[in-house]
């Protein structure tokens, strides 16, 4: 990095590690005044930490072993890329642990990595910051009523913007892993299980609507969450905007299909495929409730 005469170009390499409820991911960025932000690497490992945590508040030792192995792999990658700083964050699965400090200490002993647990608000604030950074139209968009829907494994966060200000943020306990659990229980007993899940979500959303949407006209819904953008709508994501009709058509096409068929068609792992419908159901419900005026 040192050029002639020891001049030092200010380039910094930074890694962001996210331990989510169904995957562990790391992005490595290069930051400099000249080029700004550039992504160098993006690795993901499918690991369903949320599964045990949402049912009994614990991570079993097998899962912890795998997590530490993955983090050690990430460390080697960080060395390869010459990463100077990193931030490793645990999200909802960590928030619901019975003994988070003990787990964090164990991870530190075995990997040398310090994990921060982000509160729900911090997690979503970082999400908004990233939308605001990417979308030049964000400011203009939130002048009109806009709802942001962030679908995670453990929860669904709905935020409302009106006339440029954040009106409210509500967390609803119905993320994709929880919904999938419900689906799997219902699937055995009934044919139209997607309809039942829609009902179970609709109640939560309707009460949200009664409380917050009385006089608000929602014109835009922003869907967030890596899973939606990276997996489900890869090809539509050129301009990052799809109409409600396009979403609903996609939803109707998807909802009746088996996990194996989805995995085949989308060329993704069955583990991920099993989250497709549970991720789309709350989005579809939200769109149908919030965008009634369209």
Predicted feature locations:
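Helical "lid/coupling" subdomains associated with nucleotide-phosphate turnover
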Residues: 14, 52-76, 81, 93-97, ...
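Post-signal peptide N-terminal segment of secreted/secretory-pathway proteins
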Residues: 84-86
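Short, Lys/Arg-enriched N-terminal segments with co-localized hydrophobic residues
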Residues: 1-8
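Gly/Thr-rich phosphate-binding beta-strand-loop-beta motif of the actin/hexokinase/Hsp70
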Residues: 10-37, 141-169, 226
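Conserved ATP-binding subdomain of kinase catalytic cores across diverse folds
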Residues: 36-48, 53
């Amino acid at each position: 990095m040192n050029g002639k005469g020891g001049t030092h170009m200010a380039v910094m390499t930074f890694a962001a590690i996210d331990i989510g409820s169904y995957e562990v991911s790391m992005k490595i960025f290069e930051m400099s005044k000249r080029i700004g932000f550039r992504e160098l690497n993006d690795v993901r490992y499918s690991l369903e930490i949320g599964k045990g945590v949402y049912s009994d508040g614990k991570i079993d030792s097998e899962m912890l072993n795998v997590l530490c192995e993955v983090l050690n792999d990430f460390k080697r990658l960080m060395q390869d890329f010459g990463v100077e700083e990193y931030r490793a964050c645990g999200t909802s699965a960590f928030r619901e642990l019975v003994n988070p400090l003990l787990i964090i200490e164990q991870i530190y002993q075995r990997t040398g990595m310090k994990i921060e647990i982000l509160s729900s608000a911090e997690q979503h604030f970082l999400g908004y910051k990233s939308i605001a950074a990417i979308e030049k139209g964000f400011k203009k968009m939130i002048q009109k009523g806009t709802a942001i829907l962030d679908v995670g494994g453990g929860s669904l966060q709905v935020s409302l913007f009106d006339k440029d200000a954040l009106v409210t943020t509500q967390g609803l306990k119905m993320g994709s892993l929880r919904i999938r659990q419900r689906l799997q229980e219902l699937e055995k007993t009934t044919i139209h299980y997607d309809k039942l899940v829609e009902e179970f979500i609709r109640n939560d959303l309707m009460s949200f609507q009664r409380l917050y949407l009385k006089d608000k006209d929602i014109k835009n819904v922003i869907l967030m969450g890596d899973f939606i953008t990276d997996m489900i709508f890869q090809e539509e994501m050129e301009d990052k905007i799809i109409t409600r009709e396009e979403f609903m058509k996609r939803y109707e096409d998807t909802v009746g299909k088996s996990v194996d068929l989805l995995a085949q068609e989308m060329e993704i792992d069955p583990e991920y495929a099993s989250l497709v419908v549970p991720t789309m159901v709350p989005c579809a419900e939200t769109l149908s409730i919030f965008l009634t005026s369209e």
